[in-house]
């Protein structure tokens, strides 16, 4: 099945979208605990901008709570608690670092023998 151009375009633009984030990525100091689930959904900015020099950037944020089970394997205990996560509310394409597949773009002459 082929998705029509306008639907492809509308889905790809810079906007908030539901994404999974790892709790340990958001709370790296909590490595002594296990979390269930280990990731949560939050709205985050993502998508393509019309120019490569622009980056889809959050221009509005808020804190949202998610109930998570925190397990302490050393003590054999667990409890459900509310943890806070940053959620994006607005996005814009703004000038930013030029990134290509997670790596900085190299100057064409960089790394070449002189």
Curated annotation (Swiss-Prot):
Primary location: secreted
CDD domains assigned: PDGF
Stored Gene3D superfamilies: Cystine-knot cytokines
Organism the protein comes from: Crotalus durissus terrificus
Subunit structure, interactors included: Homodimer; disulfide-linked. Interacts with human VEGF receptor 1/FLT1. Interacts with human VEGF receptor 2/KDR.
Compartment(s): Secreted
Function: Snake venom vascular endothelial growth factor (svVEGF) that may contribute to venom dispersion and prey subjugation by inducing vascular permeability and hypotension. Induces an increase in capillary permeability after intradermal injection, as well as a drastic hypotensive effect after intravenous injection. The hypotension is mediated by nitric oxide (NO), which is produced by VEGF-activated endothelium NO synthase. Induces angiogenesis and migration of human vascular endothelial cells in vitro.
Family the entry assigns: Belongs to the PDGF/VEGF growth factor family. Snake venom VEGF subfamily.
Tissue-level expression: Expressed by venom gland.
Alphabetical list of InterPro entries matching this protein: Cystine-knot_cytokine, PD_growth_factor_CS, PDGF/VEGF_dom, PDGF/VEGF_growth_factor
Record keywords: Disulfide bond, Growth factor, Pharmaceutical, Pyrrolidone carboxylic acid, Secreted, Toxin
Record's GO cellular component terms: extracellular space; membrane
One GO process term, biological-process aspect: positive regulation of endothelial cell proliferation
Segments of this protein annotated with the region Disordered: 92-114
Any one GO MF annotation of this record: growth factor activity
Name of this protein: Snake venom vascular endothelial growth factor
Disulfide bridges in this chain: 14-56, 45-91, 49-93
